Amino acid sequence: ERLDFIKLKQLTFEEPDTETFYGLKLGIKAGETGGSMPTVFNAANERAVARFLEGKIRFLDIPKLINLAMENHTLISSPTLNEILNIEQQTYDFIEETIKSGKLD
């Protein structure tokens, strides 16, 4: 059944629990930092989720990998399209190398 906003009388929102949902905290940080950091966050999340779905990492390794990628990145305040594409590939490579190295265990 579709959600009917007219029948819905009230919506209640609470502050998100960013300690339990650490990936959300990292996403907020990437957005607030700006520049090239959202690209790193997105690319790291994409690759980590893909490897989780393949059974190569644990679910809780996803935010660990994202955090490592963000910490490893040197921020570019106003990246060009070519820089964004390079950062994306570098982040994919960083995630793969980190998984292969066994640094998550």
Predicted regions and their residues:
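Catalytic, metal-anchored helix/loop core of enzyme active sites in primary metabolism
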Residues: 1-105
